[in-house]
Amino acid sequence: MKALLAIDGSSESALALETSASLTWPPGTHLEVLTVLPTEAEWYGGPWDTGVAYVPRDELDDRLRIDREALLERAVARLRRPGIGVAARLVTGRAASVIVDVAEEIGADLVILGARGHGAIERAFLGSVSAEVVDQTHCSVLVARAPSARRILIGTDGSDVAMSAIAFVGGSRLFEASTARVINAVDVDPSWWMGFTPGDAAFTVDPYVSVVDEGRVRGEKLTSAAAMLLRLDGLDTSTVVHEGPADAAIVQEARTWKADLVVVGTRGNGLMKRLLLGSTARSVLHHAAASVLVARRAVKALPHTEGASSEPMDAVHA
């Protein structure tokens, strides 16, 4: 497995680091830790404001570079363990673009970053950098809002991308110390009663109950099948079926069950599946209090390699 952790010294990126440290990285993993120095256009309004009237740009660059190099060194020390390689990289540029480009360059299976960073224009619930990275990368992305991933809630609707999310959780071997729960939501399509009015004989509660019951039976089958796959991969897994829109059901269950991490596929069976990121995944990403993993494809852990060891930090300046 190849993974990219993006950090910037913010409290949110500290959660991303702690989440990364909590994962059970399989032997042979290559983990790259990245931090991005801001361009001149991004300096204004940032937390690196010194509070003095004027500081030469070169001096500010030097201060921030020293700070970020120390940040990388601490992060690599936190993540290093036998059997995995950990490297560091420092790049100057536009944060979201650099993260996407480096993920592509190293062939990352997973990108991990905080929900919000140091940018001056970060939005309230999801930062502009993390939102863009989720939209633009071709691999799975974990947006961290919690320091671990011990309790994992996984949404499924039976679609291929939902099954890829299930396969990612089990096949990656990242969550062997975790407990999982699979959720399905019965969201009744109103098209079955369109054309009727409350006065029509056909407009009764019975059809609605029947549709909900059928949906619940289907949901129980879907969640049971997914749970069986996860149990085969060694995860203690339970199931639950909710009634209502999938995004609201997932966010509610994550709160009630106290999930650390919510896992969703990029698209489901909804009408908006033509979008790069499906409506359910986007809503959960913006509104869940837990970390969110947007899974794009399954990945299998590499078999253990004899003699595998951690690599020393190799800071790359660009």
Name every feature range the model reports, one short phrase each.
Residues 9, 63-64, 87-88, 118, ...:
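A generic structural signal for short
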Residues 1-56, 82-87, 149-209, 229, ...:
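Small/aliphatic-rich secondary-structure junction motif
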Residues 2, 12-17, 22, 26, ...:
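Gly/Ser-rich helix-loop-strand patches that form or flank binding pockets
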Residues 53-70, 203-221:
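A short acidic, glycine-rich active-site loop
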Residues 7, 90, 115, 156, ...:
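Conserved residues at beta->alpha junctions
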Residues 12, 19-22, 38-41, 55-58, ...:
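Structural beta-alpha unit
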Residues 71, 99, 166, 218, ...:
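Fold-core signature of tandem repeat domains
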